[in-house]
Regions:
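Acidic donor-binding loop of glycosyltransferase active sites
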Residues: 258-276, 286-289
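Conserved donor-binding/catalytic core segment of Leloir-type glycosyltransferases
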Residues: 5, 172-189, 195-198, 209-211
Length: 414
């Protein structure tokens, strides 16, 4: 068996937490091959999952195994940003969502290059490492071009098989048509602009926008902060007839999937500047929601489908026009979001037009969304994605024969 050390935000309620659990769950499908030990790390200020079902108990078991084990490992898998990558074992695999802008920091490339394999969530995440114009200064003062050289696999998230909770009574909405957006409130998600443009487009109509958000955590102080931020935006529109609904706090998987299927929540809208993948977008897509989003970054992997015999993929969402421009000064984060990087800016009139089309042509847009849902359950099933993860790892794993069980033709009786 291969002793695997997994360092990841396994218990974090975050995108990287989801990614970590995806990797561990995939490894766990091959218990005859992988002996798993987990070190769950924090992920910023995000809370930990509060579900104490059988999966959480299993993750706790893998954590206890690691604490009690003092030996070495054959393979390490690290789900985090590249500057935190280290060589914990003879073979090391980095797993990351990359960056939401058009390029990663040079330090990310340097650290990724020490990995034996990189697994990224999307083609956009991979592209951020592949730019040819990256320069670094050597200790002797020389400027040298930095090229990405790590072997890389692009593996998307799988669909989740969750029994959605009926939220029609728990979340009472007065309007029959409501848009939904799920976003942590920060520079990248562009929430303030979305609220403004929604109000301006539907100012005199009884239409709603359900905003599931937080700033950092899911505590009462965070809720009050988000409430104040929403009030600041809507204060400029005192006579509006449309409605903004703020949802805040922890929601279970069953509740979140119930939100996507709420009978009065019809469509999903985002004006994000960029996504490494876009998990809420993905969940909305495989739940059959019509979607409007900028046609740029990680979510393009799953919002378009391939058609047999055709080179170009078919767009299955309402594409919002955009410009690619430098990130805002306040969004720059040295070593993560470099000030010379760029991401997309949804155009105001295109966003309003996309929302109007989802509202006016709902029946046709819903039909397209159902076709996308059907396709995603075929291409992104848990079995398919978990096999992709396992196969990618076994390509670099030490002395691993993934087919050893199938090659046994006879068991001797002694």
């Amino acid at each position: 068996m291969i002793k695997v050390f997994v360092r990841a935000p396994l218990l974090s309620r975050s995108g990287y937490g989801e990614h970590a659990r995806m990797i561990v769950d995939a490894l766990s499908t091959r218990p005859e091959v992988f002996d798993i030990y987990c070190d769950p790390i924090n992920w910023g200020a995000t809370p930990w999952i509060t579900d104490f079902g059988h999966k959480r108990k299993y993750y706790d078991f893998l954590t206890a195994k690691k604490h009690n084990y003092k030996g070495t490992y054959d393979l390490s898998i690290q789900v985090t940003i590249p500057p935190e990558f280290k060589k914990y074992a003879p073979i090391n695999i980095g797993v990351t969502a990359g960056i939401e802008s058009d390029r990663v920091s040079p330090a990310w490339i340097q650290h990724a290059n020490i990995m034996d394999l990189m697994i990224v969530t999307s083609k956009h995440a991979h592209a951020g490492f592949l730019r040819k114009d990256v320069k670094v200064q050597l200790p002797n003062g020389q400027i040298q071009e930095l090229l990405y050289s790590a072997k890389t696999e692009v593996i998307n998230y799988p669909v989740k098989y969750v029994e959605p909770e009926d939220l029609s009574e728990k979340i009472s909405l007065k309007n029959d048509y409501n848009f939904l957006t799920v976003a942590q409130w920060g520079p990248r998600k562009n929430v303030s602009a979305l609220i403004r443009w929604f109000i301006e487009e539907f100012h005199n109509e009884e239409v709603g926008l359900v905003l599931k958000t937080n700033k950092a955590k899911n505590c009462m102080a965070d809720r009050m902060l988000c409430t104040d931020m929403v009030k600041q935006v809507i204060a400029a529109y005192p006579d509006k007839k449309c409605t903004i609904h703020l949802l805040h706090g922890n929601m279970s998987e069953e509740e979140m999937h119930g939100l996507y299927l709420h009978p009065k929540i019809k469509s999903y809208i985002t004006t994000t500047h960029g996504e490494g993948y876009g998990l809420p977008l993905f969940e909305a897509a495989y739940s059959g929601m019509p979607i409007a989003a900028p046609g740029w970054s990680g979510h393009m992997d799953f919002l378009c489908i391939s058609k047999e015999g055709k080179k170009n993929r078919q767009t299955m969402f309402e594409k919002i026009g955009y410009d690619v421009k430098p990130i805002q000064e306040g969004a720059a984060w040295e070593g993560v979001l470099e000030k010379d990087s760029q991401w997309c800016y949804a155009k105001e009139h295109k966003t309003k037009s996309a929302m109007r089309k989802l509202y006016k042509d709902y029946k046709a847009k819903k039909n397209t969304a159902e076709k996308l849902k059907e396709s995603l359950f075929e291409t992104h099933s848990e079995d398919i994605i978990q096999k992709q993860v396992v196969d990618a790892i076994l390509k670099v794993a030490p002395d691993a024969d993934s087919n050893w069980v199938s090659k046994i033709t006879e068991v001797a009786t002694l």
